[in-house]
Swiss-Prot record:
Organism for this UniProt entry: Nostoc sp. (strain PCC 7120 / SAG 25.82 / UTEX 2576)
Presence of keyword Thylakoid: yes
Name under which the protein is recorded: Protein translocase subunit SecA
Highest taxon listed in the record's lineage: Bacteria
Gene that encodes the chain: secA
Major location category of this protein: membrane
Catalytic reaction(s) noted: ATP + H2O + cellular proteinSide 1 = ADP + phosphate + cellular proteinSide 2
Subunit comment: Monomer and homodimer. Part of the essential Sec protein translocation apparatus which comprises SecA, SecYEG and auxiliary proteins SecDF. Other proteins may also be involved.
Signal peptide: none
Residues involved in ATP binding: 83, 101-105, 491
Role summary: Part of the Sec protein translocase complex. Interacts with the SecYEG preprotein conducting channel. Has a central role in coupling the hydrolysis of ATP to the transfer of proteins into and across the cell membrane, serving as an ATP-driven molecular motor driving the stepwise translocation of polypeptide chains across the membrane. Probably participates in protein translocation into and across both the cytoplasmic and thylakoid membranes in cyanobacterial cells.
EC number: 7.4.2.8
Length: 930
């Protein structure tokens, strides 16, 4: 009703930006006639206009028109009006909700080009290394054509490579890399080690995934601490002995476990201790983690075991997260449960949440297919508005009603039947599952029925082929099982993706002959021992060694290449080998060559031209098959998407649905659910249990009931609220840490950049003297009762150079005079100390100042992080005492922070006065001065 009275706020917003689009379209004809050189020249012209005082908004229409034309010339893609609209919204610091297949990647080129003109740098943030690389290679061509530099950050890069890439006008990087680089920069010991520039503007692709789904997980850089590994093993054995409901309760909702009195008694008896919480020999932490590992962390759901290591599986994307570990000893507990080597436990050195990381950008925009459901959260936490961009073509997707089964087994059998029917009809099917285990169970069912299918989950052998599998998921009768949103970012094109197939064929011939051998195992694939090496991948084979093969599965290709096309391809590769050298390029550079060859960008490189001719010929041959198949699949109803469980957020369900019906194609979606699914079991409560009893139906008969659907939606809303509250709590607590983090990092950066830190150290010393005076002198007592002896002793403790000072020198002075006298003495002592040190090596004192300040900041900040963690644990319990834990955390956290700052000052003063370097001819780096 309100909408009718006030009008749709989204429509009002779109209307506000419409004049920009009209102006861009009017400029199109003028821009079209420019030569390539003139089009490139526009970049310098825009920079001059900005230097003369024009704003980015002033040049927006012309800049966007230039990017549109560059996109048409380089990629053969012209931005639609709705994509232009998306670009304007991103530039204005909002979230653009754009449906799958509407070309979000292309939209990002508009605001990133415009904002890069200021020279302050733009980050385009994606969810994984593969997408960052793909976008930098693909969309980066538009920017490179227009004269801007494009950087790419990959997890395997060295600090100097990172520095170079962050210096570029536009840098493509994943959310985790940008976060870890930020933390590492704030642990650097010299400015030369800092890799990032100050943040300016970023565009986040899949913004919901990064700012909502990952917001509960902080980024942590940690160092190792020694803990006895046998405790983990013993605790794992205890956990196996203890029984659920008798010895402990499991709270699946809060993902926590609580020991009962019987449980405590049993555990203490088995361990032969009297108290699990004994500070001298603590066991509680180990036992709780072991039970969590047993009950809440399941193999092939939350993690997989690979090469004797426990590797986390991302619950939202189904991808593995190598290198990431659960903290607080939980990862070690799981390692003990799985009987693999237990890695040392870690201590947090630096941490930040994605929420606070991205709030460091003065301006940010984001794109996703699904943001409206989380609009309130985006506005409250990030002050980001969500604007829905209309689709370019009318949507023809049909969302069928849910089918609910009583038992899980009935649901899976029905899904297998539906896959078989669709396969028979020649319609492609995409099945989204929530875990590796479930995807493999369905795969087993389909195998039994003899239905050919592709499996895409976190198992390493499948991850390698991710883009390849998704690119062919639209072929006639294809059945693809994928965990969650694996394959996000790769479009499912009906009839198959001829461009991608041609690119695979090009890689197959080109890569083995051009990639440097030592580069091969960077992204290596484990091959079975004894197999011959793949196509051209060097002679001989070392069993168990990782060897890279670029050979795609033969069934991917719709047809054999003609003799002429194959000849053309071989000649192009031979020519490349002659020009570049045999197996001479790093893998990333070779990938880049393939990417450029597969696009339309003008090039002077004769190798690229030859490779491009071969690529175009192959694509043309494949297209004859895929275009016929496309029409056939469209005629049969397009892609059918099956959801196998409702997720904890409607948004993730919508992402899965969004794979079907892209760009006006037909398609359909249906969710198959059972009353045993986690969502209904954990959050549906007694109501669902009652319904289970009431429905006296067969296990494989679907139930359709309005009451059930309402229960389901209610459960989903409950989960969304529950997780939103957790994220809000994480944010509020981290907000306290954030203010402290910013203060300490700003202080640290001042020290790193500061040329002369002498004044700062003297201020530290004066402040320390003031604190000593205030501690030993009680102004309410007569001066003869002041503890001047103790005061002087304490001063000498800090500054041994003042050993001649006597208490009687201070007897006739007031408090402010004593302070002024000590300030003067400290200055003299510091000059003396500096002269002593600089005799050993000129300028050594300056290095020592920087070294000691940074060292004390880092050590005490590390200890402070642990104190804050402990404080957070303890204030949680005060909630029972009618106190607000957050207020307690803020006030006590502030006290701890002030104590830390005082200790930094005192430690630096003490360390510098006590510093006695050994005379030596040369001191190479400040870190050798210990």
């Amino acid at each position: 009703m309100l909408k009718l009275l006030l009008g749709d706020p989204n429509a009002r917003k779109l209307k506000k930006y419409q004049p920009y689009i009209t102006e861009i379209n009017l400029l199109e004809e003028d821009i079209k006639v420019l030569s390539d050189e003139d089009l490139k020249g526009k970049t310098a012209e825009f920079k001059q206009r900005l230097a003369k005082g024009e704003t980015l908004d002033d040049i927006l229409p012309e800049a966007f028109a230039v990017v549109r034309e560059a996109g048409r010339r380089v990629l053969g893609l012209r931005h639609f009006d709705v994509q232009m609209l998306g670009g304007v919204i991103l530039h204005s610091g909002q979230i653009a909700e754009m449906k799958t297949g509407e070309g979000k990647t292309l939209v990002a080129t508009l605001p990133s080009y415009l904002n890069a003109l200021t020279g302050k740098g733009v980050h385009v943030i994606t969810v994984n290394d593969y997408l960052a690389r793909r976008d930098a290679e693909w969309m980066g061509q538009v920017h490179r054509f227009l004269g801007l530099s494009v950087g790419l950050i990959q997890s395997s890069m060295t600090p100097s490579e990172r520095q170079k890439n962050y210096e570029c006008d536009i840098t493509y990087v994943t959310n985790s890399e940008v976060g870890f680089d930020y933390l590492r920069d704030n642990m650097a010991t010299s400015m030369a080690d800092v890799v990032q520039r100050p943040f300016n503007y970023c565009v986040i692709d899949e913004v919901d995934s990064i700012l909502v789904d990952e917001a509960r997980t902080p980024l942590i850089i940690s160092g190792q601490v020694e803990r006895p590994t046998e405790k983990y093993v013993q605790a794992a054995e205890i956990a196996l002995t203890l029984q659920k409901d008798e010895h402990y309760d499991v709270d699946e909702k809060a993902r926590n476990v609580l020991l009962t009195d019987e449980g405590f008694a049993q555990a203490e008896e088995l361990l032969g201790v009297t108290d699990l919480f004994d500070p001298e020999d603590p066991w509680a932490h180990f036992v709780f983690n072991a039970i969590k590992a047993k009950e809440l962390f399941l193999k092939d759901v939350n993690y997989i075991v690979r090469n004797g290591e426990v590797v986390i599986v991302d619950e939202f994307t189904g991808r593995v997260l190598p290198g990431r570990r659960w903290s607080d000893g939980l990862h070690q507990a799981i390692e003990a449960k799985e009987h693999v080597d237990i890695q040392p436990e870690t201590q947090t050195l630096a941490t930040i949440t994605y929420q606070n990381l991205f709030l460091l950008y003065p301006k940010l925009g984001g794109m996703t297919g699904t943001a409206k459901t989380e609009e309130a959260e985006f506005e409250r936490i990030y002050k980001l508005e969500v604007t829905i961009i209309p689709t370019n073509r009318i949507r023809r997707r049909e969302d069928l009603s849910d089918l609910v089964f009583k038992k899980e087994i009935g649901k899976w059998q029905a899904i297998a039947r539906e896959c078989a029917e669709m396969h028979e009809l020649g319609r492609p099917v995409l099945v989204g599952t929530t875990s590796v285990e479930k995807s493999e169970y369905l795969s087993q069912l389909l195998r039994e029925q003899g239905i050919p299918h592709e499996l895409l989950n976190a198992r390493p052998e499948n991850v390698e082929r991710e883009a390849e599998i998704v690119a062919q998921a639209g072929r006639r009768g294809a059945v693809t099982i994928a965990t969650n949103m694996a394959g996000r970012g790769t479009d499912i094109i009906l009839g198959g993706n001829s461009e991608y197939m041609a690119r695979l064929k090009l890689r197959e011939y080109f890569m083995p002959r051009i990639v440097r051998p030592d580069d091969e195992d960077v992204f290596g694939v484990q091959r079975a021992a004894g197999l011959p090496t793949g196509h051209g991948a060097g002679q001989g084979f070392v069993p168990g060694k990782k060897v890279k093969t670029w050979k795609a599965s033969p069934e991917i290709f719709p047809t054999q290449l003609s003799k002429e096309a194959e000849q053309l391809l071989k000649e192009a590769v031979d020519f490349a080998v002659r020009e570049y050298g045999d197996r001479s390029l790093p893998e990333l550079e070779a990938e880049d060559k393939v990417a450029v060859a597969a696009e339309k960008a003008p090039t002077d490189d004769s190798v690229i031209q030859k490779l491009r001719d071969a690529y175009n010929r192959i694509k043309h041959e494949y297209e004859e098959f895929t275009s016929t198949e496309h029409d056939e699949v469209v005629g049969r109803g397009g892609l059918h998407v099956i959801g196998t469980e409702r997720h904890e957020s409607r948004r993730i369900d919508n992402q899965l649905r969004g794979r079907a019906g892209r760009q006006g194609d037909p398609g359909s979606t249906r969710f198959f659910l059972s009353l045993e699914d986690n969502l209904l079991r954990i959050f549906g409560g007694d109501r669902v249990a009652g319904l289970m009893e009431a429905f006296n139906v067969e296990d494989d008969m679907p139930i359709e009931s309005g009451m059930l659907t309402r229960s389901l939606e209610g459960a989903q809303r409950k989960v969304e609220t529950y997780y939103y509250d957790i994220r809000k709590q994480v944010f509020e607590y981290d907000e306290v840490m954030n203010n402290q983090r910013r203060a300490i990092y700003a202080e640290r950066r001042r020290v790193l950049e500061g040329q002369d830190l002498k004044e700062q150290v003297i201020k530290y010393a004066e402040k320390t003297m003031d604190e000593i005076v205030d501690y030993y002198i009680n102004v309410d007592l007569p001066s003869e009762e002041w503890e001047l002896d103790k005061l002087v002793d304490k001063v000498k403790e800090f500054v041994y150079l003042l050993s001649d000072m006597q208490a009687n020198q201070l007897e006739d002075m007031g408090v402010s005079e004593i302070k002024a006298f000590l300030h003067e003495q400290v200055r003299i002592a510091y000059d003396l100390k500096e002269a002593q040190i600089d005799q050993i090596q000129p300028g050594l004192m300056r290095q020592a100042e920087r070294f000691f300040i940074l060292q004390r900041i880092d050590t005490l900040w590390r200890e402070h992080l642990q104190q804050m963690d402990a404080l957070r644990e303890s204030v949680g319990l005060r909630g029972y005492g009618q106190k607000d834990p957050l207020i307690e955390y803020k006030s006590e956290g502030y006290e701890l922070f002030l104590d830390m700052m005082v200790n930094i000052r005192r430690d630096v003063v003490y360390s510098l006065f006590m510093f006695q370097p050994q005379p030596q001819p040369v001191v190479q780096t400040s870190s050798e001065m210990v």
